[in-house]
């Protein structure tokens, strides 16, 4: 439609698990992983499970612990389920509707697919119009639904879901890290530039895990194997139990992951592209101290993502590090709240100054970045 406008939803979290041994409660594992990824999106969340090829799920607006009550999580628990996907979503105001929550489940003539997406397509409006002209009916306003339609259309025309995904990648522009679950396969997909992170882990009893960040692997007891390469399709096949890679779109020279992942988005205990997020932020603080040395009495950081850089600044400069703010742990990340008014109201109760640390002192205040200046 002519007045359609896509919201930005760069910071989402995706997760997928294939339990080869059949010993995991995959719904509970997805819940734990989404809890670990909650910092990446607080608008909505969802989990889908695969019970011998039958995919069912639940998604809604709200935080993970709000949406997945014991009763809801219990309804997804199934000893025969061997795969699960999960998603936490961030989006700006105007798109806070349940239809945009993920995983999106699509049922078609060749089976069922559940899809989770982190990223933002730059040609989504064009692709949506093309699909609408072909008769597609959209239920939400997200570019994720566009990806679902394209893969489904190609799946009906082609032999395998892997071929359908590869064909879809030919027309997608922008950022996308996907976790896709079919009847017998769990698939991870990363765009050829590698804008958004996506990693692979292994389960102790056999099986594989895909996630936006390695902290989600830790939450389910998985071991980090490697990152999904830019442009790579990684398939965990339940029929063979094997992991295989499709590299038709790998090799683009201009790969470039969003720097904000290391600066702000990711949790400091995550490992991305082989580097510790915590150490990367500390190193940024050290560089800042080298480039902008000052005389001061104390270095403080803005919780939470500014603390690591502040520690690095202190270590490099020799200026003592202090706790200058106390953060209310029940207030989420103000950057990913929908309106500026919401952000301003939240920050008043989010942070409180520790006066004994800063009163009468020369203070170096370190934050990870300035987006809106709200903090």
Q: What is each model feature region?
A:
Residues 1-230, 235-238, 242-296, 302:
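Conserved short alpha-helical segments that host acidic/polar catalytic motifs at enzyme active sites
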Residues 50-53, 183-185, 301-309, 316, ...:
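A glycine-rich phosphate-binding loop feature that marks nucleotide/adenosyl-phosphate handling sites
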Residues 81-86, 184, 214, 218-219, ...:
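Hydrophobic transmembrane alpha-helix bundles
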Residues 146-159, 311, 315-333:
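Amphipathic alpha-helical
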Residues 175-176, 195, 205, 230-231, ...:
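Active-site lining segments that contact anionic ligands and/or coordinate catalytic metals
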Residues 299, 306-313, 317, 321, ...:
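Extended, hydrophobic alpha-helical segments in both membrane/secreted and soluble proteins
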Residues 318-364, 374:
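Short, glycine/charge-rich flexible loops or terminal/linker lids adjacent to PRPP-binding catalytic cores
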């Amino acid at each position: 439609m002519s007045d359609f406008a896509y919201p930005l939803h760069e910071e989402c979290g995706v997760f997928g698990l294939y339990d080869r041994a059949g010993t995991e409660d995959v719904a509970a594992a997805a819940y734990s992983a989404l809890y670990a990824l909650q910092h990446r999106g607080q608008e909505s969340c969802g989990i889908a499970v695969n019970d011998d090829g039958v995919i069912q799920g639940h998604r809604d607006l709200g935080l993970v612990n709000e949406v997945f009550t014991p009763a809801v999580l219990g309804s997804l628990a199934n000893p025969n389920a061997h795969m699960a996907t999960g998603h936490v979503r961030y989006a700006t105001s105007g798109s806070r509707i349940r239809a945009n929550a993920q995983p999106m489940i699509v049922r078609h003539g060749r089976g069922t697919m559940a899809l989770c997406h982190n990223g933002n397509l730059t040609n989504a409006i064009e692709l949506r119009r093309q699909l609408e002209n072909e008769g597609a009916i959209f239920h939400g306003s997200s570019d994720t639904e566009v990806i679902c339609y394209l893969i489904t259309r190609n799946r009906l025309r082609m032999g395998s879901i892997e071929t359908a995904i590869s064909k879809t990648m030919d027309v997608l522009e922008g950022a996308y890290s996907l976790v896709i679950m079919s009847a017998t396969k769990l698939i991870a997909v990363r765009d050829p530039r590698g804008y958004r992170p996506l990693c692979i882990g292994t389960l102790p009893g056999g099986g594989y895990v895909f996630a936006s960040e390695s902290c989600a692997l830790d939450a389910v007891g998985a071991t980090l194997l490697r990152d999904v390469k830019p442009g790579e399709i990684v398939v965990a096949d339940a029929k063979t139990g094997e992991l295989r890679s499709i590299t038709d779109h790998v090799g683009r020279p201009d790969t470039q992951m969003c720097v904000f992942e290391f600066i702000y988005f990711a949790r400091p205990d995550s490992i991305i592209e082989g580097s510790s997020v915590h150490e990367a932020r500390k190193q940024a603080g050290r560089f800042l101290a080298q480039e902008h040395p000052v005389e001061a009495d104390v270095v403080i950081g803005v919780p939470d993502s500014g603390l690591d850089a502040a520690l690095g600044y202190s270590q490099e400069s020799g200026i003592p590090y202090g706790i200058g703010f106390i953060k209310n742990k029940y207030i989420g990340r103000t950057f990913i709240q929908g309106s500026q008014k919401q952000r301003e109201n939240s920050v008043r109760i989010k942070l409180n100054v520790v006066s004994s640390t800063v009163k009468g002192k020369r203070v170096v205040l370190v934050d990870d970045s300035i987006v809106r200046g709200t903090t």
